[in-house]
Amino acid sequence: MSIAVGMIETLGFPAVVEAADSMVKAARVTLVGYEKIGSGRVTVIVRGDVSEVQASVTAGIENIRRVNGGEVLSNHIIARPHENLEYVLPIRYTEAVEQFREIVNPSIIRR
């Protein structure tokens, strides 16, 4: 299984909450965090199997449109991020989200 990273950058916090909620409901992914960029920009980050992350990002983008004033600024999926990224960028599975990772995919072996 290839673990991917999916990101959606939105304008406004309500839009990112809607994106995050719809992303984890639509596919077997784990929400690993969000980043406040500034000027109302917020990015939500999920991880999981490549196909699940693709479905998740698609659902997030579609549902942001339901939020009054919600706007998708950008989105991207990295299919197999280099492990060095985990140590520098906020895409790691932290202790706080590990329980949800196991629920999403109980066969995952912890590193």
From Swiss-Prot:
Descriptive protein name: Carboxysome shell protein CcmK1
Homology family: Belongs to the bacterial microcompartments protein family. CcmK subfamily.
Gene3D superfamilies: 3.30.70.1710
GO MF, one example: structural constituent of carboxysome shell
Superkingdom assignment: Bacteria
Gene behind the chain: ccmK1
Role: One of the shell proteins of the carboxysome, a polyhedral inclusion where RuBisCO (ribulose bisphosphate carboxylase, rbcL-rbcS) is sequestered. Assembles into hexamers which make sheets that form the facets of the polyhedral carboxysome. The hexamer central pore probably regulates metabolite flux.
SUPFAM superfamilies linked: CcmK-like
CDD domains in the cross-refs: BMC_CcmK
Domain-level remarks: The tight homohexamer forms a pore with an opening of about 5.0 Angstroms in diameter which is positively charged. Sulfate ions are bound in one crystal form in both the pore and between hexamers which may represent metabolite flux. The C-terminal flexible tail, which is the most variable part of CcmK proteins, seems to be involved in packing of hexamers in layers.
Keyword Cell wall biogenesis/degradation: no
Compartmental location: Carboxysome
